[in-house]
Regions:
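Intracellular juxtamembrane helix-capping segments at the cytosolic ends
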Residues: 109-122, 284-299
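Extracytoplasmic gate region of multi-pass secondary transporters
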Residues: 192-236
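Symmetry-related core transmembrane helices of the 12-TM Major Facilitator Superfamily/SLC fold
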Residues: 153-172, 331-349
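Central cavity-lining transmembrane alpha-helices of secondary-active solute carriers
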Residues: 46-64, 230-241
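C-terminal transmembrane helical hairpin of 12-TM major facilitator-type secondary transporters
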Residues: 253-289
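Conserved MFS/SLC helix-loop-helix module at the cytosolic interface between two early adjacent transmembrane helices
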Residues: 57-88
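Helix-loop boundary and gating motifs at the non-cytosolic
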Residues: 6-52, 209-219
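Glycine-rich segments within core transmembrane alpha-helices of 12-TM secondary carriers
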Residues: 125-147, 306-322
Length: 376
């Protein structure tokens, strides 16, 4: 308990909580928009697919921009875009294609701003960014519930504006050194013996699997609003615990905990809520691990590193829009195989727990040679 208390009192941990609220409100706004829009649309399945593509994929590019211009408080621009999208769609009845573009870019900006702020102010710890990311899960279900009730647009806009003081307060934690390229050099979680390019590919693959399983996990028990709320709450708790426990007991232990122990609960929890929720919580922990690995490889580009995780989430969730596996035996087989593969990958690409003295690869100019995206 003393170690847990120590982690929860880590330097600048408040930044994680501040951006958890900002992330929560961001997802409330986005899923309020999506739920309202899809309820009135004849192309209901297209809109979430378009949203996922536009909200997830560009985050790497925006992240790279923020890496270059780290002093720019881009989150305030994101708030303005989210508010504009809501007013365009539900106040001015504009074309949804235009408003969803504005909404998604605003969403991208808010995510990248949170990642940049929590990573740069964490001194190599994972709890800060894990707490920030966890806030979004609570926002998803809250936004859906608000869209199903009678809530005036002005109240939703007011909720959006409450993010501004939190953004300004989070920004006060920045010191001059946190804006520099060296801010994330304390992230040393990746295996130094494996090529950085290969680590990025493998870590992104693990994120793809997590993205798929987030939609593909059999949860036939999930029939009521209360059960849906519990599912998203447990997802959020799992994401936060992944970072907190990694700082407490070590990232390799959490890697095994979050993948191997999740298997029986995910496989046999289809009709039993509590068993399923335990599995969901365990596997959600991998978020912090993969982010920590990617930032270790790209310490001078934390925004870009975060972007790889969101691209992975999109690639993992996209197949669900086109193919749905009905046979639970096939689903369970996939869960077992993919979980074991992810365990093997994580243990290979993670560095040794006590090998923190050396850096992995601090001259990351190799990146443009692989991806041709070091464009600024």
């Amino acid at each position: 308990m003393s170690k847990l208390a120590e982690v929860l009192k880590e330097k600048n941990i408040a930044v994680g909580w501040l951006y958890a609220y900002i992330h929560f409100i961001t997802e409330v706004l986005c899923f309020y928009y999506l739920t309202k829009l899809t309820n009135d649309s004849a192309i209901i399945w297209v809109i979430p697919l378009v949203y996922d593509a536009l909200a997830f994929v560009p985050q790497g590019l925006i992240g790279r921009f923020c890496d270059k211009f780290s002093r720019l408080n881009i989150a305030l621009i994101g708030v303005a875009m989210l508010v504009a999208a809501l007013i365009m769609q539900f106040g001015l009845n504009s074309n949804w294609i235009l408003s969803i573009w504005v909404l998604c870019i605003g969403n991208c900006i808010m995510h990248v701003a949170g990642a940049e702020c929590t990573l740069r102010n964490s001194e190599g710890k994972l709890a800060h960014s894990a707490i920030f990311v966890a806030g979004g899960s609570f926002g998803v279900i809250t936004g859906r519930l608000l869209a199903s009730s009678i809530v005036p647009l002005w109240l939703i806009v007011l909720m959006a504006l409450t993010m501004i003081p939190f953004i300004l307060l989070a920004n006060t934690y920045y010191k001059d050194e946190n804006y520099k390229e060296t801010a994330c050099l304390n992230f040393n979680y990746a295996n130094k013996k494996i090529a950085p390019f290969l680590i990025i590919v493998l870590a992104t693959f693990v994120v793809i699997v997590r993205g798929y399983m987030g939609y593909g996990i059999p949860t036939s028990w999930n029939k009521t609003t209360t059960q849906a709320v519990l599912l998203y709450v447990i997802m959020g708790v799992g994401k936060a615990l992944g970072g907190i426990l990694s700082d407490c007991i070590g990232i390799r232990k959490v890697a095994v905990l979050s993948t191997v122990l999740a298997i029986p609960f995910l496989c046999f929890g289809d009709n039993i809520m509590i068993i399923s929720l335990i599995g969901v919580m365990f596997f959600s922990m991998t978020m912090a691990i993969t982010l920590g690995i990617l930032v270790s490889v790209l310490p001078k580009k934390p925004g870009l590193a975060f972007g790889f995780t969101t691209i992975g989430l999109f690639l993992g969730s996209a197949p669900i829009f086109f193919v749905k596996i009905i046979d639970n035996r096939i689903n369970i087989g996939l869960i077992v195989i993919m979980s074991l593969v992810c365990t093997f990958i994580l243990l290979k690409i993670l560095g040794k727990e006590h090998d923190k003295s050396k850096t992995l690869e601090r001259d990351d100019n190799w990146l443009w040679k692989c991806f041709l995206i070091d464009f600024i």
